[in-house]
Amino acid sequence: MKLFLVSIVLVGMLVLAAARPERDIDSFDEQEEKGFVKRGASCDCHPFVGTYWFGISNCPSGHGYRKKCASFFGVCCVK
């Protein structure tokens, strides 16, 4: 019975993953044009104040960032 339930859950997950649209996430530039881009929090990049971006190791291109500092699970970018 337990194996049957686990199998049903796994099959359901596979069906949902396969049903996902091929291109459901717009590029960063397309999001910016639509006004969907969220800004990061402020951070210190000694002695400057920058924008903290979580989960990436480089600053987003095309935004005029000229300096970056590594931060906890992300990067601090300074214009």
UniProtKB/Swiss-Prot annotation:
It holds the Pfam family Defensin_4. Highly expressed by the mesenteries. Moderately expressed by the pharynx. Weakly expressed by the gonad and pedal disk. No expression in tentacle. InterPro entries: BDS_K_chnl_tox, Myo_ane_neurotoxin_sf. The keyword Disulfide bond applies. GO terms for biological process: defense response to bacterium; innate immune response. Keywords: Antibiotic, Antimicrobial, Cleavage on pair of basic residues, Disulfide bond, Immunity, Innate immunity, Ion channel impairing toxin, Nematocyst, Neurotoxin, Secreted, Signal, Toxin. Disulfide bonds join 43-76, 45-69, 59-77. Induction: Transcriptionally up-regulated by immune challenge. The keyword Secreted applies. GO terms for cellular component: extracellular region; nematocyst. Its main location: secreted. Residues 1-19 form the signal peptide. One of its GO terms (molecular function) is toxin activity. It is found in: Secreted; Nematocyst. Residues 20-39 form a propeptide. Peptide with both antimicrobial and neurotoxin activities. Cationic AMP with antibacterial activity against both Gram-positive bacteria (B.subtilis, MIC=11.49 ug/mL) and Gram-negative bacteria (E.coli (MIC=12.21 ug/mL) and S.enterica (MIC=11.95 ug/mL)). Shows no significant antimicrobial activity against bacteria S.aureus and P.aeruginosa, as well as the fungus C.albicans. In vivo, induces reversible paralytic activity towards the shrimp P.paucidens. May act by impairing sodium or potassium channels in the prey. Belongs to the sea anemone type 3 (BDS) potassium channel toxin family. This is Crassicorin-I.
